[in-house]
Each structure stands twice: as structure tokens, then as C-alpha cells.
């Protein structure tokens, strides 16, 4: 039979998989932002139907609670931009940014569900006259070096451990093939 291990995804058939710790990644990111003095931290998340989103939101909320910061539901907005969404997806991101930035107490930093969203946000925020990082800080998720290192200012991002996930998936697959897993 065909042996298979999924990396950074899973199915409902119980196929062996290796997943990142999305909870811990978001927790660590938010804790680092709090350590830099941020207290109003918005989170513009990926689609709420994704299990990773639930875990990341839990990490976000726990980091706030651990720092004795109140969770403000108005700072948590789903805003995923799917590649296939076209203009509708871009509009969703614009609307989410406008929503949190027009609050009576706007955030000092916005965390985005992934680095692509954060990259798009740089342009949106600048078009609104918001200076980065003087007026607002931005953080992403994934640690895509092509994005994080290219943007100015550089993007803070929780890094998905792609290499470690690949190595672990390979080890599991080899174990299945050799009958040791």
C-alpha cells in the first residue's frame, strides 16, 4: 500500500501528519509585542473555518491574559485574503483595517494571519497616511523571508518551522516504510 505523511496540513481520514504549534507561535509573537510595550494589539486573522485560526486566536488571547491585558473583541477581525478572492478579498482586508483603525482607541500594532496579508497591509496603511512603524506596527505569521526581509520596515513574524516539519514528516514516512513507525 502507498505510504503517506501530510506536512502542515491534515485530512479527516486520519492520515499521519506533522503540524506546527500554531497556538505557541501566536502566543510567542504576541508576548514579544507586549514586551515591546504594545497593549492595544489587533489580530486580523485567517478565515475562522481553519483549525489553525482557532489555535492562533487562543494563543493571542492567552498572551493578553497572561499580561493582564483585557481581550477586546473589536480588535479581533477575520480578514483572510485568498489568492482566488480577487477584489473581494482585498476589500475584506481594507474593511478590516479601517474597522480597527477607526476605533476610539485604535491598536498600536496589528497582527495579520499571514505574511501575505501583512505585505498587502503595508500598502493599504501607507495609502491611509499611516507611517510604519511611527504610527502603527505590523506583524505577520509564517516567517516567509522573501516578505519579512524585503518590506521596510522589516516585518516581525511568527516563523512556521517548515524545515523541521519536513524533516519530521520524512522521518515518519521512512519509519512507515521500514516498519518502525
Give residue ranges: language-model regions.
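Bacterial carbohydrate/catabolite-sensing allosteric modules
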Residues: 2-181
Amino acid at each position: 500500500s502507498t505510504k503517506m505523511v501530510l506536512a502542515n496540513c491534515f485530512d479527516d481520514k486520519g492520515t499521519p501528519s506533522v503540524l506546527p504549534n500554531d497556538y505557541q507561535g501566536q502566543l510567542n509573537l504576541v508576548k514579544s509585542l507586549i514586551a515591546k510595550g504594545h497593549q492595544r494589539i489587533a489580530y486580523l486573522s485567517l478565515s475562522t473555518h481553519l483549525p489553525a485560526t482557532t489555535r492562533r486566536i487562543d494563543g493571542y488571547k492567552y498572551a493578553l491574559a497572561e499580561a493582564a491585558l483585557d481581550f477586546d473583541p473589536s480588535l479581533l477581525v477575520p480578514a483572510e485574503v485568498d489568492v482566488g478572492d480577487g477584489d473581494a478579498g482585498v476589500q475584506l482586508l481594507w474593511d478590516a483595517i479601517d474597522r480597527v483603525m477607526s476605533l476610539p482607541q485604535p491598536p498600536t500594532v496589528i497582527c495579520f494571519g499571514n505574511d501575505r496579508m501583512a505585505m498587502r497591509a503595508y500598502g493599504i496603511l501607507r495609502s491611509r497616511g499611516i507611517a510604519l512603524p511611527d504610527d502603527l506596527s505590523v506583524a505577520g505569521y509564517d516567517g516567509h523571508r522573501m516578505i519579512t526581509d524585503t518590506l521596510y520596515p522589516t516585518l516581525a513574524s511568527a516563523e512556521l518551522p517548515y524545515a523541521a516539519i519536513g524533516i519530521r514528516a520524512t522521518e515518519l514516512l521512512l519509519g512507515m516504510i521500514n516498519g518502525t513507525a
